[in-house]
Amino acid sequence: MSIDLPALFFSASGRIGRLRFWIGALALLFLGDSAATFLRSWFAPGIQPQLIDFAVTALLAWPDFCIGRKRLADRGRGIFFALAYTGYSLLAALISIFWPLLSEKPDGSFESSLFLAAIYTCTLFFVVECGVLKGVKGPNAYGPEPTLP
């Protein structure tokens, strides 16, 4: 099994199966978490940790979009779903910066619980849509069926 990493992370065309999606998503998760941890220790305590998290998320937005776009194309989903996939990550990271300023209530408040429920619902949707469900059999509008799952 050979994976073209530049195409996986930097090309938004074509389709990928679940295996390549998980490899790419977990690689980005590891890279993003490692970079954020390093940057937090480098800049701490002078900068808000959520700001670093947003910066890392923004830097990884294009590779994240490419992986999500190709996997969602395999599922027969259009560009709207791919934009929502990446936009959701950016929006969640951005809201985490301003949430303490906007919410004067404790973390256990109804608004906090509602926000977390929305985050978890979106996360669950994309995990199932991209990582669990099979792609469309045969060629579709986005290209031929991937050779690997």
Residue ranges and their predicted role:
Residues L31-A61, Y88-F125:
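Membrane-helix interface segments in multi-pass membrane proteins
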Residues W22-I23, I52-A55, L83:
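Hydrophobic alpha-helical transmembrane segments
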Residues A25, F81-L90:
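Central hydrophobic cores of alpha-helical transmembrane segments
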Residues M1-G32, D64-I79, V127-P149:
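Membrane-interface extramembranous regions at the lipid-water interface
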